[in-house]
Amino acid sequence: MKMSKRKIFVSFDFENDRNYKYLLEAWNGNSDFEFEFDDKSTREINSWNISTIKAALTRKINEADYTIVIVGKEANKRHKDSQLIGYKNWQNFEIAKSKENGNKLIAIKINSLYESPEKLLNSGASWAYSFSEDAIMKAVRNA
């Protein structure tokens, strides 16, 4: 049974975890997978301007009903521009904006040893503890 297309923003570390995002997109395009979504994520934002990036991310987050957070190795690492971002890094910013927008949170922990973004803790997120379709679908249904 196919799930109806959920409007999902995917929060991930572009430098280190984009392959996981691309895998979600591939599942979405493959009828053999139950995982299906209306991708509200941004393409790479072609700007170094913090306020431009914030505005683009916020607009896309506000178009979504769900936010999937891919928790990779660097997910809670302090960004060099954290003071300007207003959060430890971009993923923490995206989680905070998702919570403000009322998005349901789904966290996918790639490795149990990876530190979760601080804004994800005590957020009521639904968790998947492996990057598998079954674990992710269960977390999506429980969100």
Residue positions per predicted region:
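Conserved N-terminal substructure of TIR/SEFIR domains
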Residues: 1-63
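C-terminal interaction surface of TIR/SEFIR-family domains
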Residues: 1-7, 111-143
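Short beta-strand/turn micro-motifs composed of small residues
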Residues: 12, 71, 109
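Short catalytic/ligand-binding loop motif for oxyanion handling, primarily in non-cytosolic enzymes
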Residues: 17-20, 76-79, 113-119
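Short, well-ordered alpha-helix to beta-strand connector turns
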Residues: 64-65, 102
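Conserved TIR/SEFIR loop-to-helix hotspot centered on a Trp-containing motif
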Residues: 75-100
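A short helix->loop->beta-strand "cap" motif at the edges of active sites that frequently abuts
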Residues: 100-106
